[in-house]
Structures are given as structure tokens and as C-alpha cells.
Amino acid sequence: ATPSMADRVSCELHGVPWFILGWPGGDTATIKPEGYEAPLLEREFHHGILDCYALVRDWYAREWGIDLPNFPRRDGWWNDGESLYERYCEEAGFYRVGDLRKGDLVVMQIAAQGGSMPAAPNHAGVYLGDGLLSSVPGLHAAPGTFLHHRYGKKSSRDVYGGMWAERTVMILRHQRAPEET
């Protein structure tokens, strides 16, 4: 059995060893908390563990040393009409802005699985500006990009514009964001 990124992240979160049983076949593996952190780029998607908000939390912690709360969220919450981003943004230290600069949280309403438009904003990413990540050495610059993690896909940097800008419903800045970025 090979532990997934979600297994390893969850093991770290709980702080206890995990025993993994592969099914079918019965292969086993044991993992222990050893400081594992999922990569910011190319991470697997697992809702509630490695999703777009988890990526946002990890970016803020690694790049700016800001710890964001891990709010409870069940899969498909965006279809209920309540925007968890709007509900929790102030509690997490964010406020709305009209301009866009590095480190801002870009909240969007994009088509969900099956192509239907959700009832509430359901996706977020971090605007990178120059596209660089200090926690990812050797990464080439990619001006105008943002970091995000779409449902069922691997996390990526994409150019912020076009569809992404059209689907943006709010831009949020953290109260502890550096003045010059």
C-alpha cells in the first residue's frame, strides 16, 4: 500500500502513526508523523484535506508565516447557497479590496462537477504577481499568475485573467499582508 498525500497530511494533523491497508490485495504500510508537508504545486486533490482552501492556508503559512484557521467544510457546500469564504473571511483576518497585489485571496464562482454553476462562490486562489514561491526553490517566474487547486485536479499556477477574472466575485487581503509585495 502506498500512502497518498492526503494520508500523509492527515497523519501529521493527528500526530499519531497510521496503518494503511491496500484494498484489494491486503498490502500494508505504516507512516508516522515526520513533518511532511504536501507540495504547493502538483498536489493531489482531496476535499477538506487537500483542496483550494487548504492550498491557501499552506501558502500563507509557508510564504508569509500567517496561520489561517481550518474551517469545517463538507463536500458540495457551495450548492447550499452559503458562501463559506464570505462567512469566514473576516474571522480569518481578511478584508475586501478593489485592487490586486501579490498575496491577495481571489474568490471565484466556477462551474462545479458536471458543469453546473454553484449557488455560492466555491473556489479560491492566491495571486502570485511574479509567480514565484519562496518555498519552492528554482521555480521560474510567471508574471500575472495565481496559485489554485481545482476540484479533482492537481494544484497549479495559471495566468490570472480571462475566465478566472470574469468568475472572480471578491478580492481579499489579509490584515497582516506585507505593505510592499
Question: Positions of the model-derived regions?
Answer:
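Short, Lys/Arg-rich amphipathic segments at extreme N-termini
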Residues: P39-G48, W164, L172-Q175
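...with weaker cross-activation on analogous glycine-rich loops/strands in unrelated enzymes
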Residues: S4-D7, R73-S155, Y160-M163
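Active-site-proximal loop/helix of nucleotide/amide-processing enzymes and allied scaffolds
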Residues: A1-E34, L41
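Active-site nucleophilic cysteine motif
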Residues: E44-W64
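Surface-exposed patches in mature extracellular/periplasmic domains of secreted proteins
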Residues: L68-P72
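Glycine- and charge-enriched low-complexity intrinsically disordered segments
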Residues: S155-T181
